[in-house]
Amino acid sequence: MMRDRLASLIVVKQEGGSNTSISHHQATAIKCEASLYTESSLFQEINNNSCYRQNLNAPTHQQSHTSHLQHAQQHQTHQQHPLLPPPLPTLPLIYPCRNLFPDGCDINHLACCSSSNSNSNCNSDSNSTSSSPGNSHFFANGNTCAAALTPAPPATEPRKIKPLGAGKLKVGKTDSNSDSNSNCDSRAAAAASTSATSATSATTLAATAAATAAAAEAGGAASAAAAAKISQVRLTNQATTSMLLLQPNSSFSSLSPFDNFSTQTASTTTTTSASAAGHHQHHNHLLHQQHHNQQQQQQQQQQQQQQQQQQQEHLQQQHQQQLVSPQQHLLKSETLLSHEEDQLISNLTDSSVVSHSELFSDLFFPSDSNNSLLSPTTSGYPDNPAEDLTSSIENLTKLTCLRDKRLSSIPEQQLSSEQEQQLCLLSLRSSSDPAIALHAQQQQQQQQQQQQQQQQHQQQQQHLQLQLISPIGGPLSCGSSLPSFQETYSLKYNSSSGSSPQQASSSSTAAPTPTDQVLTLKMDEDCFPPLSGGWSASPPAPSQLQQLHTLQSQAQMSHPNSSNNSSNNAGNSHNNSGGYNYHGHFNAINASANLSPSSSASSLYEYNGVSAADNFYGQQQQQQQQSYQQHNYNSHNGERYSLPTFPTISELAAATAAVEAAAAATVGGPPPVRRASLPVQRTVSPAGSTAQSPKLAKITLNQRHSHAHAHALQLNSAPNSAASSPASADLQAGRLLQAPSQLCAVCGDTAACQHYGVRTCEGCKGFFKRTVQKGSKYVCLADKNCPVDKRRRNRCQFCRFQKCLVVGMVKEVVRTDSLKGRRGRLPSKPKSPQESPPSPPISLITALVRSHVDTTPDPSCLDYSHYEEQSMSEADKVQQFYQLLTSSVDVIKQFAEKIPGYFDLLPEDQELLFQSASLELFVLRLAYRARIDDTKLIFCNGTVLHRTQCLRSFGEWLNDIMEFSRSLHNLEIDISAFACLCALTLITERHGLREPKKVEQLQMKIIGSLRDHVTYNAEAQKKQHYFSRLLGKLPELRSLSVQGLQRIFYLKLEDLVPAPALIENMFVTTLPF
């Protein structure tokens, strides 16, 4: 069962009486005590983790001799003035005290008795009903003694104890005794008026009991002050003394560092104080020598204890080195607090008469404090005692708050077993015996070393497990076949070098790493408010990682305080309900307290009630709260930093519903493929660039400084704006569309880059390059408006090349053959003149088209001179017919000579073919140029005549020609097919040919070209039986040719005009007989 300990602050105030004069006797006492502490070299210096004492052999013989002379002088002065009332102290004395009793206080501070006899004795009997030895008697020979705080009953009378509540005001009155041989028995229990449970007062610290007894039995105020090293006291007459005890009920669940320090220094303080008191009272040299020997033994024991402390500190040195950056930040805050404390101490103490009491400083402050604060000191001499008491309480309150800040970093020791609890109780009960206290401390240190060894063993095992690194850089999850959160989302982690209280608290279970790199969350672009502390050097345990990811989805984060981590907690704080809530100089731990990160190793002293008069701590706390509120921190809930908040279930549900709604709105396409949330980089196609996916965080394995910045990951639950766009619809339908800037400008195929000034595909680039380098000439067999696309770009080279020029491809950019393979350089030597290789043969259909085009009259050069002539005789009309027929046959002769392979035939066969086909070609070409809705007739020489002008000469043959023209135009024949048809009319099987095989081969070539044209031409494919219908026109031409011969024979019979030789030869050649 644990003992409750209370931090007590006793304020003793002396109220002034009627007599305000200071006698010579009083001045002598003040001088005596001042000289004692002016020359004394015994002082105490308290640092952060060790207590150093200097000159433990004091007081010296010189001090004792001086004290003896001063006592004699005081006795003589008192005999000269026997009627003077006994002096009493009037200065406000502020003595901090630790009360370790649960229900009250049983302490006598400076209980003195007053007597006019120089040989009077003052007995201070501190009795106790506890099982521990409770009686301690000290005899002091002095001139003046203050009366007890309460009237002392006779020695034979049983002592009565009046119970009072703990923490209440206890006021006693002083009494004067003029008897020179009177004995003042000062009872500590009756003076403090504690509750009935003060029977356990003997279990108090040895330093407290020794100081109380020594002060109570001191022969005079100066001797008592010398025993306890009390500051200078000013004495007045007929005054009363009051004590104010502030005792907040704060339960301590573990052994505080104060108890460790008290058990270590109890024997030293007790023996030193007792020896000093006995030496000044009896002036015995032998006792002084024994006191000196005891001090040497105590020094040896203290050195042993310091060595043990150094060993214990050496074990924790690694952990302290890892917290360098927080300690540097703590050093600045401690420097500021020390400066503020010095200012407040200067208000409480007088610079000329400031002296510290080693006894009460040891009792009140832990061994690892930096400066001696709140020592029993005497302030100045105020005019109004009430104002002085108020100001002292205010300054003491501020110093208590500051001291709590500095001492809150002291880790509380946890009682993990019943054996440790018994050991702690034993150390408390036997603190009066230095040997027992030292033995208890050694046992406690041995248990701590065993516990540290076990923890180190566990840390090594965990370190071996954490050394398994996953391929993506994160630690493998222990005991699970599935990847951990770090392995799956390692892209959201980076390293850090800061120290955090959570990691500091878990340092006992997690293995320390030498690289100070741990995985922490970091989003993209860094938008978190600055953190006051990062992660510690040790990697997080798997349980902590699970807690981390679980708590990220909560609005407020609460970190569980596990039993194995509470001992290393660097900063503990808890919520205050309102008003000041003092915890003395100890960091009280509440069972329901949560770990709260702080900006330094020591936790902040938090409270709600800040008075308007508290200009120092109130402003500081308000500034800290404002700085926390700026970064969205909650100072009372322990939330000093923020982790990225992952999307909650509601947000994920909203986002999923929005995506499903967008997919349902798209008609005619499959549902979109859901992207997996994997840490990989994806390349988005240009068409799908509008559908932005969430930006992935980048992995950075670098150390983070203490003031790290992070950003909260927020989920955009709005529906995708590109879900209803045409590009996304095409993506869902499986069609991948590309932007127009990435397509070929000529044929529409995919284009990688620009060629010759225009973005074109590789096919069009090569076609344009070959055409320019070879100087090829193409002929369009249609109307020079052929479609050029990816599928039909190879059908008409003429139109494809023209489109290349139209879109802006530059011919001058193409390298010639002489510069081929020499980019930007001219040939060093000109090549020898060589004949250029023959150009590849032009396609047959292209040659036929060219022959037709070359022998067709230009529409701009037509001859309208004979159009609609009115005055013409019939002979002129017949003569005009012969001229038109002769000129047309000459043009047809030119067309025949341009047909490829025509000159390969025998001249006889050439003449036969021409004479047989000349009249057919005349009709075919005339019918092709004629229009049904037009009355004009255009002949091969370019002459234009009206249809009525040809009736006399053509007769009924003209009507048949116009009918053939109608049927020819109904076929919608193009120029390429018409050129092939003209060639087939000439190159055909005739009677009397000498080499009909060659004529047949040439005919088959022309037919093959016509078939290819009809097959691959888009317009020709739309016509049914187009090829057979074209070939069916050849027999019709022969019939029309026969009709023409008949008309010529008729005109020859009329003999109006003689027929030309060409006509006669043609007539004779074509006759069947």
UniProtKB/Swiss-Prot annotation:
Compositional bias (Low complexity) at which positions? 59-82, 175-185, 263-277, 292-326, 441-458, 495-514, 619-636
Disordered as annotated region, ranges: 55-87, 150-185, 263-326, 437-458, 492-514, 529-579, 618-640, 819-841
Which Gene3D superfamilies does the record match to this protein?
Answer: Erythroid Transcription Factor GATA-1, subunit A, Retinoid X Receptor
**Which ranges does the entry annotate as DNA-binding region?**
741-816
* Highest taxon above the source species: Eukaryota
Q: In which tissues is it expressed?
A: Ubiquitously expressed in preblastoderm embryos, specifically in central nervous system and intestinal tract. Highly expressed in third instar larval imaginal disks and brain complexes, but not in ovaries.
Q: Return the GO cellular component terms, semicolon-separated.
A: cytoplasm; nucleus; transcription regulator complex
Where is composition skewed (Basic residues) in this entry? 279-291
**Per its UniProt record, what InterPro entries does this chain match?**
NHR-like_dom_sf, Nucl_hrmn_rcpt_lig-bd, Nuclear_hrmn_rcpt, Znf_hrmn_rcpt, Znf_NHR/GATA
Respond yes or no to whether keyword Nucleus is given for this record: yes
> Where are the annotated NR C4-type zinc-finger regions?
744-764, 780-804
List GO BP terms, alphabetically. cellular response to corticotropin-releasing hormone stimulus; cuticle development; positive regulation of transcription by RNA polymerase II; regulation of adult chitin-containing cuticle pigmentation; regulation of transcription by RNA polymerase II
Domain NR LBD, first and last residues per copy: 840-1070
Entry keywords, A to Z: Developmental protein, DNA-binding, Metal-binding, Nucleus, Receptor, Transcription, Transcription regulation, Zinc, Zinc-finger
**Where in the cell does this protein reside?**
Nucleus
Q: What is its main location?
A: nucleus
Family stated for the protein in its record: Belongs to the nuclear hormone receptor family. NR4 subfamily.
> What does the protein in this record do?
Binds to NGFI-B response elements. Plays an important role in late stages of epidermal metamorphosis.
Assembly and partners?
A: Forms a heterodimer with USP.
Name recorded for this polypeptide? Probable nuclear hormone receptor HR38
UniProt source species = Drosophila melanogaster (Fruit fly)
Taxonomic lineage: Eukaryota, Metazoa, Ecdysozoa, Arthropoda, Hexapoda
